[in-house]
Amino acid sequence: MSQAPSESLSATAYGTLPPASTPSARKPLSLPRLREMHAHGEKITMLTAYDATFAAVADAAGVECILVGDSLGMVCQGLSSTVGVTLETMRYHTECVTRGLRRSQGVAWVIGDLPFGTYHESKEQALRSAVVLMQAGAHMVKLEGGGWTTETVRFLVERGIPVCAHLGLTPQTVHALGGYRVQGKTDESAALLRREASALQDAGASMLVLEMVPAALAAEVTQQLTHCATIGIGAGSGTAGQVLVLHDMLGMNLGKMARFVHNFMDGAPSVRGAMEAYVRAVKNVSFPDNSVHAW
């Protein structure tokens, strides 16, 4: 005879969603709380998730921010890049993630990626797209790009929509960049990245993903920004936080693993255990190791 599910679990027809790891000690993440963490130098942890179960497990493992990334185009849909991901797809997966968090009484901060072509035409187009993801349950939207996005960021923030910006390698423009390559390696490109980071902070961005930029440059930008938390991926350990694609950190990549990825599933007792190991490693700054995972 099977046991009835514990009251601390959210039962489904096919299993259970885990509760937050220590519900009494964890409060819902908010923008003021994330700013407080940044101000006190506490590392911010972020992972991608695309469905209810993985979102709930990540939250239970202590991950503070869940990015519903357009990377789902590559890891879930089999696309060769993120360019083909649609706003409707992002809305659907954002709803899945936030539904899972509600059912498991999760506390994570949810960020929805604005896909390619949904914010490029005008500020008004960006607002319409952002509203779709916010109504799907996102707490913040993310968009890629430098100086040309600053007025869009300002426009959204002025209308009450928190924004995470994204510099360095911007996967939506991978064709223009000539592939997945480290950015900011020259003095000129590094100076441009620093200027754009400051402009995005001034426009109101609360977070800034730095992807595949030299560790020294990422650390410099992090120190330069006083009220915009940098989140690194392939940008060394000097950023305010870290993000990885879920499938990568679980070792579910059948191709060549990117330099900045670590397989946290190796030696872990479970998926949740792997996520908890990731959180610990980011918090104690043992991941990323600049000699292994950065440039």
From Swiss-Prot:
One of its GO terms (cellular component) is cytoplasm. Residues 1-29 are annotated as: Disordered. Signal peptide: none annotated. One of its GO terms (molecular function) is magnesium ion binding. Transmembrane segments: none annotated. Binds 1 Mg(2+) ion per subunit. 3-methyl-2-oxobutanoate binds at D70, S71, D113, K142. One of its GO terms (biological process) is pantothenate biosynthetic process. InterPro entries: Pantoate_hydroxy_MeTrfase, Pyrv/PenolPyrv_kinase-like_dom, Pyrv_kinase-like_dom_sf. Keywords: Cytoplasm, Magnesium, Metal-binding, Pantothenate biosynthesis, Transferase. It catalyses: 3-methyl-2-oxobutanoate + (6R)-5,10-methylene-5,6,7,8-tetrahydrofolate + H2O = 2-dehydropantoate + (6S)-5,6,7,8-tetrahydrofolate. Its EC number is 2.1.2.11. Mg(2+) binds at D70, D113, E144. Catalyzes the reversible reaction in which hydroxymethyl group from 5,10-methylenetetrahydrofolate is transferred onto alpha-ketoisovalerate to form ketopantoate. This is 3-methyl-2-oxobutanoate hydroxymethyltransferase.
